[in-house]
Amino acid sequence: MNSDVIKGKWKQLTGKIKERWGDLTDDDLQAADGHAEYLVGKLQERYGWSKERAEQEVRDFSDRL
């Protein structure tokens, strides 16, 4: 997971993140503040995914940046 890319461009990415995962709230994204592991946890919580699935989703997202 390229968490450096996510952290470094967090403010620019929040719109794309909300497009991809619309169940995440502005508060979720503000609290995550670019931390991929927090984002993974929120995806698990909001979508009921396993940790592995949420990590893969974030990995796929960051690979497309």
Swiss-Prot record:
Pfam family, one: CsbD
InterPro entries per the UniProt record, alphabetical: CsbD (IPR008462), UPF0337_stress_rsp (IPR050423), YjbJ (IPR026042), YjbJ_sf (IPR036629)
Source organism, top-level taxon: Bacteria
Matches recorded under Gene3D superfamilies: YjbJ (1.10.1470.10)
Protein family: Belongs to the UPF0337 (CsbD) family.
Protein name in the entry: UPF0337 protein PA4738
Organism: Pseudomonas aeruginosa (strain ATCC 15692 / DSM 22644 / CIP 104116 / JCM 14847 / LMG 12228 / 1C / PRS 101 / PAO1)
